[in-house]
Amino acid sequence: MKLLEQIEKWATETPDQTAFVWRDAKITYKQLKDDSDALAHWISSEYPDDSSPIMVYGHMQPDMIISFLGCVKAGHAYIPVDLSIPADRVLRIAESSGAKLLLSAAELTVTDLPVRTVSQNNLKDIFFTHKGKIPNPEHAVKDDENFYIIYTSGSTGNPKGVQITHNCLVSFTKWAIQDFNLQTGQVFLNQAPFSFDLSVMDIYPSLVTGGTLWAIDKDMIARPKDLFASLKQSNIQVWTSTPSFAEMCLMETSFSESMLPNMKTFLFCGEVLPNEVAKKLMERFPKATIMNTYGPTEATVAVTSIPVTQEVIDTYQSLPVGYCKSDCRLLIMKEDGTIASDGEKGEIVIVGPSVSVGYLGSPELTEKSFTMIDGERAYKTGDAGYMENGLLFYNGRLDFQIKLHGYRMELEEIEHHLRACSYVEGAVIVPIKKGEKYDYLLAVVVPGEHSFEKEFKLTSAIKKELNERLPNYMIPRKFMYQSSIPMTPNGKVDRKKLLSEVTA
């Protein structure tokens, strides 16, 4: 499969079919082709002998999708950067990626970036002035060339750029279309920001099958009235989100088959799917199939899936995350480096063509997490799990990396930035669970010198600093102040003791 060719055929076969909808803005497959062609032609003329990645900044604007395809047609991987990402983090991505160009689909609020920036208006001008120009198809990203690079949390305080090739994405997309029984021309929910790789689960299966992406932005999510008004008119048939987002929607009693009468498939990834959420969805949408999936960004979105039936719910207290896609395989590795038997816990290792080629510009980090097994790329996930007759069960993180509301983050990165704040002498992040999954982050802080009379004022000052360094979803919800942090005899932070103290 050549991904771009599959997407472009809809511009010929169904040119007026809507490819993407966001609020009052929409684009057809013909517009998507014409504008991405124009942009690719401009990029190739400006950067003729260059294949450095291109940053694409914005939120849910149609120009984001156009820019992604324009970059790839010109032979450049794209780096999606959501406008919610703090300026400091955007700067670090720009510096570490080697990008020379940033395309802005929204107003750019970050200044002093070491890259050339194309404003929202200038982007529109490029679409207009280069209209009708066809890029050289030989320039397009192909095979093992990078298609996109998504930055995830890094333990040193610096984000890591996960490189996903054309072949990685083709492997995922072909499997998703077949395994999830996706049909031509369906309407897909697009809820995850493009800088979160869950969005790939809807973008490319939709575009390859001539579907329509229906985007829900963060402002809608913050205003349930707007959210459900949009869902009502969407006619969504394929739902892609974290379980947390579906759980939030289930709090609205009208969120059911009556609101979305043609709902066919729920696709969940990014965090644990609780049994209760699956049960409620089955009650509200009796005709829909619920798919539970698993996979890290480093293995292209997801590599396992299972339909969650009543039998599965009745059989398992914690839902399994599924069977591996046919072109990949899973190994459960014990601490001694041997492969675990059925039912034995260990680290989940993913082997096959879905696996990333590594972290951009970080050979040491790549060597630590990626390897070759029997001539194929393999990724050591750091996730704990076990297999039973080919079925994978996920048991959380082996290290201090967690998933909170679908976002993966390393607690050490948050601690790194928290300790760098004024008024903070020492700090540890404690993730607090509610049932099976993480509910919020608690910051246990040893304060430095300060003149605040009340703890809440100190907390506000620390949060203000953190907001300049970290995305909102990585900011701890609660703060607790102590005179010291408990330590183990080895001189390490005693996290178990700390957790027992704060949850007692």
Swiss-Prot record:
D-alanine binds at residues 197, 301, 492. Pathway: Cell wall biogenesis; lipoteichoic acid biosynthesis. It comes from the Bacteria. It catalyses: holo-[D-alanyl-carrier protein] + D-alanine + ATP = D-alanyl-[D-alanyl-carrier protein] + AMP + diphosphate. Its EC number is 6.2.1.54. ATP binds at residues 152-153, 292-297, 383, 394-397, 492. Its main location: cytoplasm. It is found in: Cytoplasm. Pfam families: AMP-binding (PF00501), AMP-binding_C (PF13193). The keyword Nucleotidyltransferase does not apply. Catalyzes the first step in the D-alanylation of lipoteichoic acid (LTA), the activation of D-alanine and its transfer onto the D-alanyl carrier protein (Dcp) DltC. In an ATP-dependent two-step reaction, forms a high energy D-alanyl-AMP intermediate, followed by transfer of the D-alanyl residue as a thiol ester to the phosphopantheinyl prosthetic group of the Dcp. D-alanylation of LTA plays an important role in modulating the properties of the cell wall in Gram-positive bacteria, influencing the net charge of the cell wall. Belongs to the ATP-dependent AMP-binding enzyme family. DltA subfamily. This is D-alanine--D-alanyl carrier protein ligase. The keyword Cell division does not apply. GO terms for cellular component: cytoplasm. GO terms for molecular function: ATP binding; D-alanine [D-alanyl carrier protein] ligase activity. Keywords: ATP-binding, Cytoplasm, Ligase, Nucleotide-binding. GO terms for biological process: lipoteichoic acid biosynthetic process. It comes from Bacillus cytotoxicus (strain DSM 22905 / CIP 110041 / 391-98 / NVH 391-98).
